[in-house]
């Protein structure tokens, strides 16, 4: 029994971070029980993809305890319903919600053959997928008899509080607020007046970068090949990960930030850092690769109803949105 911490920023307390401990247990498990308060759309999409790619995880039961009474976004609800359909069709588990009371706990149980580990503490499911999250979490790591007791407690919680998401009434109202960037590390919100002043100025340099819609790169990195570790576990690319591959005729222009970091300020008031990378002397492209950038791009498309879960960005997507360049 020991505590584990997020270890983000300058506060490294334990040797292994909470994310590393959770993911190691998850990768080696054949059965997983999860009871969490909140989930993000991207965490559910990525969990679904992982289960498609790794069939050694035989069963997952997931209880989402807060959203049914507090409110879902359309994307959250849709991704959970799709995950539930997949799990039930494959006979590998189900997704549950709490329609009677708000459940705010965070409990996880991992069974690897007969060995059981557990985690209980402050971290919602989202924390284990989102490397941009700024919230510092801590959990208690259990094994042996305490882990077996926690497993039984999670099963009891799901049984007593949970109803399958398809067996409860569909929500009549959804939350449409786009908060993808609000809790991200390195992201600031800029006052509207400052944004108006900045965008009223004439830029010294101006670049129009086409939004490319290749099947498995650029804005569709999620659909590229996942990362396979030594044990054969395949982890998909993050849903919000993107890369903008910029052609040499743009990168060679005066003022383009070659191999350096720069500050991004968006028209809807977000500020964060990006950087260009790539071997300028050997290739005709450079990359701006950042999950925060992807949250902004895909978040805009999602909030305008142009992009759905597990859907590729196409020219039609961009035309529907009304902009095909940056």
Swiss-Prot record:
Single GO biological process annotation from the record: DNA restriction-modification system
E.C. number(s) listed in UniProt: 3.1.21.4
Presence of keyword Hydrolase: yes
Keyword Ribosomal protein among record annotations: no
Keywords carried by this UniProt record: Endonuclease, Hydrolase, Nuclease, Restriction system
Biological function: A P subtype restriction enzyme that recognizes the double-stranded sequence 5'-GCSGC-3'; the cleavage site is unknown.
Protein name: Type II restriction enzyme NgoFVII
Organism: Neisseria gonorrhoeae
Phylogenetic classification of the source organism: Bacteria, Pseudomonadati, Pseudomonadota, Betaproteobacteria, Neisseriales
């Amino acid at each position: 029994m020991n505590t584990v911490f997020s270890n983000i920023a300058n506060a490294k307390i334990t040797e292994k971070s909470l994310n590393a401990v959770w993911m190691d247990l998850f990768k080696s498990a054949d059965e997983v029980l999860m009871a969490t308060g909140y989930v993000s759309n991207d965490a559910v999409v990525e969990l679904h993809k992982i289960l498609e790619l790794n069939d050694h995880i035989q069963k997952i039961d997931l209880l989402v305890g807060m959203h049914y009474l507090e409110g879902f976004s359309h994307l959250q609800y849709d991704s959970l319903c799709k995950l539930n359909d997949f799990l039930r069709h494959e006979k590998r588990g189900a997704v549950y919600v709490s329609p009677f009371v708000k459940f705010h706990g965070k409990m996880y149980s991992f069974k690897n053959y007969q060995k059981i580990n557990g985690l209980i503490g402050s971290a919602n499911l989202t924390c284990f997928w989102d490397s941009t999250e700024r919230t510092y979490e801590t959990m208690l790591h259990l094994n042996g008899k305490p882990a077996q007791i926690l497993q039984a407690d999670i099963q009891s919680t799901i049984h007593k509080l949970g109803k399958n998401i398809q067996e409860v009434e569909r929500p009549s109202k959804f939350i449409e607020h786009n908060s993808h960037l609000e809790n991200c590390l390195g992201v600031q919100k800029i006052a509207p007046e400052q944004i108006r002043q900045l965008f009223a100025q004439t830029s010294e340099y101006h670049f129009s970068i086409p939004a490319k819609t290749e099947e498995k790169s650029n804005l569709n990195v999620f659909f590229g090949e996942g990362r396979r570790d030594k044990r054969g576990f395949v982890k998909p690319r993050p849903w919000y990960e993107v890369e903008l591959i910029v052609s040499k005729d743009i990168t060679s222009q005066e003022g383009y930030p070659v191999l350096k970091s720069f500050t991004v300020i968006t028209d809807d008031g977000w500020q964060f850092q990006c950087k260009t990378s790539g071997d300028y002397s050997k290739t005709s492209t450079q990359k701006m690769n950042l999950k925060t950038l992807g949250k902004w791009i895909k978040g805009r498309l999602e909030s305008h109803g142009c992009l759905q879960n597990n859907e590729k960005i196409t020219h039609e997507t961009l035309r529907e949105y009304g902009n095909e360049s940056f």
